[in-house]
Regions:
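"…together with the soluble PPM/PP2C metallo-phosphatase catalytic core" -> "…together
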Residues: 1-177
Length: 177
């Protein structure tokens, strides 16, 4: 993404793909009208390229990559509605959540059908992987995965905004994908 940003950001400026600021928002945000948006494409491209380099050695990357691209599509649609359709709100929260639920549901379904998933989790600070205490979540594993995935995705979304705060958070999340 460090290589792509200097190329893509000026291109987004040229296309006038800038942030639309709501009139009823904070006055401080008005000066940021036109801040380039759709920068998520840069991060998504970097994550996809990096993942594809390792996919042959670790095919377990595929479902996580699917989920990442799916969430990226939701972000793209949100930005597209804001920029091209000139609706500063983009997708409403319910539409975003429905999309996230569908993508996460497909991911969880794949995990459960693959037979490779372990529904037990290590209780922290109980002795490590070999001697620790494990809690078998059983079918509670499904809502747990939804909670973790949707919480992580929306945590990044809440941090995202006009100030470029998403960059540091996205780097952390992408590192642990």
């Amino acid at each position: 993404s460090a290589i792509l940003c200097p190329i893509v950001i000026p291109f987004l400026h040229k296309l006038k793909f800038g942030q639309q600021v709501r009139d009823d928002g904070p006055q401080a945000h008005l000066k940021k009208q036109g801040t380039p948006t759709m920068g998520g494409l840069v991060f998504l491209t970097a994550v996809v390229i990096t993942s594809l380099l390792y996919i042959r050695d670790n095919p377990r990357i595929i479902p996580v990559l699917f989920m990442t691209v799916g969430f990226g599509v939701i972000g793209f649609l949100d930005d597209y509605i804001k920029i091209v359709m000139k609706r500063s709100e983009g997708l409403n929260p319910v539409q975003k959540l429905i999309g996230q639920f569908i993508i996460t549901g497909i991911f969880v379904y794949y995990l459960m059908c693959s037979g490779e998933v372990e529904t037990s989790m290590l209780v922290p600070f109980t002795g490590g992987f070999e001697h620790g205490i494990y809690l078998n979540l059983g079918f509670l594993f499904i809502p747990f995965v939804f909670f973790v995935v949707l919480g992580t995705d929306n945590g990044v979304n809440f941090t995202d905004g006009l100030d470029g705060l998403c960059t540091s958070v996205t780097i952390l999340v992408a590192t642990f994908l």
